[in-house]
């Protein structure tokens, strides 16, 4: 009896830790993406579409990101509709859960966007090139850590990551290669939007290139240093050797 109670308490504690790491990861990721936009040097490829739309049409960045994520979820659902039986229903349920995740995540973006000033306009020492590069590096570190934490918990994926995984599975190619393809598509479409509606690129710059090159490295380094300990704390990996 006591053994069963201990097991239940351990499972409950692990579940709470798992959700705690997941939500903390989403917060850190939202902070990283927001800092990325505030540095004014180019944003991450996957959100370049929503950022360009928010600037060109003077819309809320978080709301535009929610629309973008909604499109990503609908694409995943359309692909999963071909699946039959219990597996198909399970995949569609996982897709549907990305909608409430998107609402919460984009509200985080809005809160951080209000609290953090744009460095291009604030007129402080941080608005110089060195200051903006420093904020960009901090943004990429936060983005990598947040993505690593939330993805490692294996709960509801961020719609961007979910789309990459679904497309990789559908076309039978590696996730890394598909991520590069999706990033390239987003960058090209953002450039076209900017040139057509603003007469110049919007949201694409050195920060975009740095995000492509460095965020994956940050994720790998975080997993190497903290991954095993975090997974054990979340109950996803045994502490035994």
Mark where each language-model region is.
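Extended, low-hydrophobicity, polar/charged segments
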Residues: 2-241
